[in-house]
A protein has these predicted regions:
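Acidic/histidine-enriched ion/cofactor-binding microenvironments in catalytic or ligand-binding pockets
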Residues: 73, 145, 151-153, 169-180, ...
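Solvent-exposed alpha-helices and their adjacent loops that cap or buttress functional pockets
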Residues: 29-30, 52-53, 72-74, 90, ...
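Flexible loop/turn segments at secondary-structure boundaries
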Residues: 20-21, 88-89, 128-132, 162-167, ...
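Intrinsically disordered, low-complexity coil segments
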Residues: 24-34, 182-184, 245-258
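Charged (often Lys/Glu-rich) extended helix/loop segments that serve as interaction or gating elements
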Residues: 188-348
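Active-site-proximal beta-alpha core segment in soluble small-molecule metabolic enzymes
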Residues: 1-157, 167-168, 177-180
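Short glycine/threonine-rich loop-to-helix capping motif typified by GTGT followed
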Residues: 132-138, 164-174, 199-206, 210, ...
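Flexible, glycine/charged-enriched surface loops at secondary-structure junctions
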Residues: 153-155, 186-190
């Protein structure tokens, strides 16, 4: 967080605890206010009290009731209205839970004015892992329409959920949409690229601790689980890929391939649904092999538990931009990794 602050990055906070952590980075309340958004549309009283004490930046509302809640405590920092936008096709859509419908925005604005609550702008989120990047353009247009009755400078929060694989395309789409906005409309554009920043920040290295024959290929157990670093699978609908690190004997013998066949990776817990991945084209593994899972920084450690008494893995920090040479001898990851559908949240 210190590095981010030094780089001029602001903080999108969801709770009182996150506000406390962010506030500790700043020398003055005014600097903290200018660098934060309390972006949870539904806040408990204790967190609102923390935000007022710390003098956070604006919060977010998506209902008349939330505006009334703020007015009751004499909230002074202003609010952004979170609007519901098209997030169909995103890996993690949010509009079923968050966001005001277009028809409800005028009522929120009217109630806010009558209660002395300043509306400072609009926020939206097209869903994490957005697959249709044109949704950003449509959401920006909707945000501008929602701002139409307002006067003075406004904030538009573009949301987050940016994936490393599509970030540059998403950024280009957003930039083109912003360029089309008349310069006479004074807007401060902000976004929440937390996933993008965190994704490549951490790799996971895990040993294979078990192997046995199954009805269709091998069944392997690794020293991690869905309840640990792979919580990104049920909660974030991730499909992690891995690389096997070659052992010294293979490197010396220049043996670069193993047989490929169907296989399943299970986690180490006593839960039978603790399945990490399955594939019809998985390289055969052996007990003692180490697997390298790149890009395991987003929604992994933060949601990990110690279920069944298994500890969280040791964290090793490095300033190197490339992996250590010992990690560079590996086999290609499996192709066509299947989604483990029975451990995912249901999709309506």
């Amino acid at each position: 967080m210190k590095w981010l602050k030094q780089a001029g990055v602001g903080f999108d906070c969801a709770s009182g605890m996150e506000l406390e952590k962010a506030a500790a980075l700043f020398d003055t309340p005014s600097a903290f206010t200018a660098s934060t958004v309390f972006a949870n549309p539904c806040k408990p009283p204790r967190d609102l009290a923390t935000a007022m004490r710390l003098q956070s930046g604006p919060t977010v509302v998506d209902s008349v009731e939330e505006v009334q809640k703020l007015a009751a405590i004499n909230w002074k920092q202003g609010s952004l209205i979170r609007i519901a936008v098209d997030d169909q096709g995103s890996k993690m859509p949010f509009s079923k839970k968050f966001g005001a419908a277009v028809k409800d925005i005028p009522a929120i604005q009217t109630i806010a004015r009558s209660l002395g609550q300043e509306i400072k702008g609009i926020s939206f989120h097209v869903g994490s892992g957005c697959q249709d990047l044109t949704q950003y353009s449509r959401a920006i247009q909707l945000a501008l329409l929602s701002l139409a009755p307002s006067k003075g400078p406004k904030i538009v929060d573009l949301g987050g959920g940016f994936e490393t694989e599509t970030f540059h395309k998403a950024a280009k789409c957003i930039q083109e949409s912003i360029k089309a906005v008349p310069s006479t409309i004074p807007i401060q554009w902000i976004a929440e690229p937390g996933r993008f920043m965190a994704s490549d920040f951490q790799d996971l290295f895990v040993p294979v601790i078990g192997k046995k024959a199954g009805s269709n290929g091998w069944r392997y157990t690794i020293d991690e689980s869905l309840y640990g670093q792979f919580s990104c699978i049920p909660f974030d609908r991730a499909t992690p890929k891995w690389l096997r690190i070659q052992n010294e004997g293979e490197i010396a013998a220049r043996k670069t391939t193993r047989k490929r066949m169907p296989g399943v990776l299970f986690g180490r817990t006593c839960d039978s649904v603790d399945m990490i991945a399955q594939s019809d084209d998985m390289e055969e593994l052996e007990v003692g092999d180490w697997l390298w899972f790149p890009k395991m920084g987003a929604y992994t450690s933060v949601t990990a538990t110690e279920f069944n008494g298994f500890p969280k893995p040791k964290v090793i920090y490095t300033e190197e931009s490339q992996p250590h040479p010992m990690f560079m001898g590996f086999e290609p990851w499996p192709t066509k990794i299947k989604t483990v559908s029975h451990v995912l949240a249901p999709q309506n």
